[in-house]
């Protein structure tokens, strides 16, 4: 059985400021650095053999902290990037016009083929993050990889493993530096292939950050 751990990056400056990040970037806050160190301590106990990370700055930094604790090299994979949020990237959420807010809401309310202008659809996101996960099956026998990615990207990945369409209403909360695990297995009582073992575990964090849309 292949076990793959999924970690969302630590809290960033734009998370704290309620700005839309997408594939734009901002650095980890002091709290985000602390979260990354806490998840690294947890990861060290899991026997991680490979760290595969989105190549955006916030995931790079989170992955670096985890890699140092685990003694692993990092493989960067652009397929693990966050959803491209087009013309709304870098914008403060409270500054959006009614039309712009409607574009944003399409990504979370189950709108088929919803997308922000110049951005990605949830199906496009799903195709690439699932392809990145499938690549883990090519690792040597006995590998235990950890993927560092983003909130919407990982939420979409876990939801599609559960059989939901990529564009389904977003109902899975994955906080900064939460840990999820998915397994590839053959089972008598589960569908063959990928299954979700756990999602959004934050028991290793002292004080989880609020999601940027809850502030």
From Swiss-Prot:
Site feature Transition state stabilizer, where: 150
Disulfide bonds: none
Gene3D superfamilies: Phosphoglycerate mutase-like
Catalytic activity: (2R)-2-phosphoglycerate = (2R)-3-phosphoglycerate
UniProt-listed SUPFAM superfamilies: Phosphoglycerate mutase-like (SSF53254)
GO cellular component, one term: cytoplasm
Classification via InterPro entries: His_Pase_superF_clade-1, His_PPase_superfam, PG/BPGM_mutase_AS, PGM_Phosphatase, Phosphoglycerate_mutase_GpmB
Protein name: Probable phosphoglycerate mutase GpmB
Pathway participation: Carbohydrate degradation; glycolysis; pyruvate from D-glyceraldehyde 3-phosphate: step 3/5
Organism superkingdom: Bacteria
GO MF term (any one): phosphatase activity
Family, as annotated: Belongs to the phosphoglycerate mutase family. GpmB subfamily.
Active-site residues, Swiss-Prot/TrEMBL: 9, 82
Record-listed substrate binding positions: 8-15, 21-22, 58, 60, 82-85, 104-105, 151-152
Keywords for this protein: Glycolysis, Isomerase
Lineage start: Bacteria, Pseudomonadati, Pseudomonadota, Gammaproteobacteria, Enterobacterales
Gene Ontology terms: biological process: glycolytic process
């Amino acid at each position: 059985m292949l076990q793959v751990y999924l970690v969302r990056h630590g809290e960033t400056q734009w998370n704290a400021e309620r700005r839309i990040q997408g594939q734009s970037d901002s650095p980890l806050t002091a709290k985000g650095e602390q979260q990354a160190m806490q998840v690294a301590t947890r990861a060290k106990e899991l026997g991680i053999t490979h760290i595969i990370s989105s190549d955006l700055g916030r995931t790079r930094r989170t992955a670096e902290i985890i890699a140092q604790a685990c003694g692993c090299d990092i493989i960067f994979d652009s397929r693990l990037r966050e959803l491209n949020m087009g013309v709304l990237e870098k914008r403060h959420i409270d500054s959006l016009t009614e039309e712009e807010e409607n574009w944003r809401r399409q990504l979370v309310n189950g709108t088929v083929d919803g997308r922000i202008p110049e951005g990605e659809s949830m199906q496009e996101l799903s195709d690439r993050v699932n392809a990145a996960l499938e690549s883990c099956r090519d690792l040597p026998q006995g590998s235990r990889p950890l993927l560092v990615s983003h909130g919407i990207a990982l939420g979409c990945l876990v939801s599609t493993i559960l059989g939901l369409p990529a564009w389904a209403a977003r109902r899975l909360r994955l906080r900064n530096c939460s840990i999820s695990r998915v397994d590839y297995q053959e089972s008598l009582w589960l569908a063959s292939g990928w299954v979700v073992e756990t999602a959004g575990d934050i028991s290793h964090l002292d004080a989880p950050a609020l999601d940027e849309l809850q502030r």
